Structure formats: C-alpha cells, structure tokens
C-alpha cells in the first residue's frame, strides 16, 4: 500500500479549510520561497512570502481564474562573488496557489523583504446562509 503526502498541495488551497484540515498529514515539506498563510477570520486571509534580496520590480503577481501565481526573478550581480558562506538564497521562482470560489485579491504590499498578499472571500447573497424567521401560527382545530 502506498501513502501519498498531500499536505504540500493542500497548503496552497486557500479557502478550502475544512478539506485541508481533514486531509493534511504531519509531514510538511516547503519549497522556495518560504511562505505563511494566515486566516484572520472566515472571509480574510493573508499570504506572506519571505523574499530577502528581491526588489519590488523583480516580482509579478497574476490571478488566472482561481489560480494565483507569484513569480520572482532577482537581478544578478554584475560582478562574480566568492562566498565563504551563502545562507541567503536569491533565485528565480514561480509559486501558485489555488483559491476557492469567490476569493478575491484585495491588495499586495512589499515591505522589508516580505510580500503580503491579502485575500477576501465575497459570498454572493444567494450562496450565503439565510436565516428563516419562525412565526407563531394558531393551532389547527380538529
């Protein structure tokens, strides 16, 4: 029997919390760049990517249907550097996230090497749960 670790895929499905929580396993692998996904309430999320060494001009964010794609291509230094130790990675990347229906990108900011992408869920009224009022009705006479 084979066990497949779906957690790397589930982390990138934003707005599918119940599915992600039900299927996520203990082993978590992370690719470059490191990122966090925060949930402030049922309708507001934030993706934060750590992008040390990148400039705002090096980054591109696109929304293709329900697929959010973040790409980065850092400028290469003009002269070759000899590293004694290189702990900071600055390489080109493309990272995509699958958003749930009715999720919208409400904004993006790049401050101190952190790219913040804010997401909002906008449920149409016909999809949102509706409260039905219960009225008192006279009893039926038999």
Swiss-Prot record:
Cysteine disulfide links: none
Cellular localisation: Cytoplasm
One GO cellular component, as annotated: cytoplasm
InterPro entries linked to this entry: A-crystallin/Hsp20_dom, ACD_IbpA/B, HSP20-like_chaperone, HSP20_IbpB
Keyword set, alphabetical order: Chaperone, Cytoplasm, Stress response
Keyword hit for Chaperone: yes
A biological-process GO annotation: protein stabilization
Pfam families linked: HSP20
sHSP domain boundaries: 26-137
Coiled-coil residue windows: none
SUPFAM superfamilies hit by this protein: HSP20-like chaperones
Superkingdom of origin organism: Bacteria
HAMAP family in the record: HSP20_IbpB
NCBIfam families reported for this sequence: PRK11597.1
The protein's role, per its UniProt record: Associates with aggregated proteins, together with IbpA, to stabilize and protect them from irreversible denaturation and extensive proteolysis during heat shock and oxidative stress. Aggregated proteins bound to the IbpAB complex are more efficiently refolded and reactivated by the ATP-dependent chaperone systems ClpB and DnaK/DnaJ/GrpE. Its activity is ATP-independent.
Family note: Belongs to the small heat shock protein (HSP20) family.
Domain notes: The N- and C-terminal flexible termini are involved in oligomerization and in the binding of non-native substrate proteins, and are essential for chaperone activity.
Subunit details: Homodimer. Forms homomultimers of about 100-150 subunits at optimal growth temperatures. Conformation changes to oligomers at high temperatures or high ionic concentrations. The decrease in size of the multimers is accompanied by an increase in chaperone activity.
Descriptive protein name: Small heat shock protein IbpB
Naturally occurring in which organism (per UniProt): Klebsiella pneumoniae (strain 342)
């Amino acid at each position: 029997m084979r066990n497949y670790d779906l957690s790397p895929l589930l982390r990138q499905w934003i707005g599918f919390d119940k599915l992600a929580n039900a299927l996520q396993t203990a082993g978590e692998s992370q690719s470059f760049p490191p990122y966090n996904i925060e949930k402030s309430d049922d309708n507001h999320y934030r993706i934060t990517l750590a992008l040390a060494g990148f400039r705002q001009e090096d980054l591109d964010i696109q929304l293709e249907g329900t697929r959010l794609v973040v790409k980065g291509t850092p400028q290469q230094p003009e002269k070759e550097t000899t590293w004694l130790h290189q702990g900071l990675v600055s390489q080109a990347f493309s990272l995509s996230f699958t958003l749930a229906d009715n999720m919208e990108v409400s904004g993006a900011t790049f401050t101190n090497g952190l790219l913040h992408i804010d997401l909002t869920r906008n449920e149409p009224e016909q999809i949102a749960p509706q409260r039905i009022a219960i009225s008192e009705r006279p009893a039926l006479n038999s």
